UniProtKB/Swiss-Prot annotation:
<feature type="active site" description="Electrophile">
    <location>
        <position position="94"/>
    </location>
</feature>
<comment type="subunit">
    <text>Homodimer.</text>
</comment>
<comment type="pathway">
    <text>Carbohydrate degradation; glycolysis; D-glyceraldehyde 3-phosphate from glycerone phosphate: step 1/1.</text>
</comment>
<dbReference type="Pfam" id="PF00121">
    <property type="entry name" value="TIM"/>
</dbReference>
<feature type="binding site">
    <location>
        <begin position="233"/>
        <end position="234"/>
    </location>
    <ligand>
        <name>substrate</name>
    </ligand>
</feature>
<feature type="binding site">
    <location>
        <begin position="9"/>
        <end position="11"/>
    </location>
    <ligand>
        <name>substrate</name>
    </ligand>
</feature>
<dbReference type="GO" id="GO:0006094">
    <property type="term" value="P:gluconeogenesis"/>
</dbReference>
<dbReference type="InterPro" id="IPR022896">
    <property type="entry name" value="TrioseP_Isoase_bac/euk"/>
</dbReference>
<comment type="similarity">
    <text>Belongs to the triosephosphate isomerase family.</text>
</comment>
<feature type="binding site">
    <location>
        <position position="212"/>
    </location>
    <ligand>
        <name>substrate</name>
    </ligand>
</feature>
<dbReference type="GO" id="GO:0006096">
    <property type="term" value="P:glycolytic process"/>
</dbReference>
<feature type="binding site">
    <location>
        <position position="172"/>
    </location>
    <ligand>
        <name>substrate</name>
    </ligand>
</feature>
<comment type="function">
    <text>Involved in the gluconeogenesis. Catalyzes stereospecifically the conversion of dihydroxyacetone phosphate (DHAP) to D-glyceraldehyde-3-phosphate (G3P).</text>
</comment>
<dbReference type="GO" id="GO:0005829">
    <property type="term" value="C:cytosol"/>
</dbReference>
<comment type="pathway">
    <text>Carbohydrate biosynthesis; gluconeogenesis.</text>
</comment>
<keyword id="KW-0413">Isomerase</keyword>
<dbReference type="InterPro" id="IPR035990">
    <property type="entry name" value="TIM_sf"/>
</dbReference>
């Protein structure tokens, strides 16, 4: 049985003070959660948030990292810096990173490997655009992203990582993926993992849904067999909304 994982991606929101206030409010609301709870603040908020979650069931993730150990990469963060802070998870290959910052499946793969070297659990994002969806090449696109992004890993590593399926076409477009579409597509992603690493590994991999998840949609989504959690955007910025999702 896979333990559900619900992660809040705060994106470029919340000052340090606001971040601490949000976590303070969130802690008592999610203390009895049956799923793994993760918050992913900005880099500058990580130390304060890590301090605030001590003794709670909330884990902390970063939103990105570089694949090199150190060097002349102005504005970037190395994995060992996150490891030293005590960060547990790191989001890799988010659609916004791919869209605005030239993230590719190859760089995703480098980052995934490096994350494991530094005891970080990657939340690896994949998803297709509206154009790709309407061109009926969803499976081809996802297969390419997974086969490159998750290549050359050990079975043990793949079992530990989390995959987040974000249908880019359903984010901010007014179009939504039905629960059936989400379940079917996540089932397909699991099949790709099975082809690469075998059935027992695919059965253990947790795959989240990340297409505009809200308190009103989560229960039906989590009732679906293939969906193991959610990568939550805007709704994770309000403690009560995020708690409602966590306590689905």
């Amino acid at each position: 049985m896979r333990t559900a994982i619900i992660a809040g991606n705060w994106k470029m929101n919340k000052t340090v003070k606001e971040a601490v206030e949000l976590v303070k409010e969130l802690k008592p609301l999610v203390k009895d959660a049956k799923c793994d709870v993760v918050v992913c603040p900005t880099y500058v908020c990580l130390p304060a948030v890590l301090e605030e979650v001590k003794g709670s069931n909330i884990k902390v993730g970063a939103q990105n990292m570089h694949f090199e150990e150190s060097g002349a990469y102005t504005g970037e963060i190395a994995p060992k810096m996150l490891e030293e802070l005590g960060v547990h998870y790191v989001i890799i290959g988010h659609s916004e990173r791919r869209q605005y910052f030239n993230e590719t499946d190859e760089t995703v793969n480098k980052k995934v490997k490096k994350a494991f070297e530094h005891n970080l659990i990657p939340i690896v994002c994949c998803g297709e655009s509206l154009e790709e969806r309407e061109g009926n090449i969803t499976e081809k696109v996802l297969e390419g992203q997974i086969k490159v992004g998750l290549k050359e890993l050990s079975k043990e590593q793949v079992e530990k990582l989390v995959i987040a399926y974000e249908p880019i076409w359903a984010i901010g477009t007014g179009k939504t993926a039905t629960d059936e579409q989400a379940n079917e597509t996540i089932g397909y992603i699991r099949t790709v993992v099975k082809d690469m690493y075998g059935e027992s590994v695919a059965d253990k991999v947790r795959i989240q849904y990340g297409g505009s998840v809200k308190p009103g949609t989560i229960k039906a989504q989590m009732a679906k067999e293939e969906i193991d959690g959610a990568l939550v955007g805007g709704a994770s910025l309000k403690a009560k909304d995020f708690a409602a999702i966590v306590n689905y």
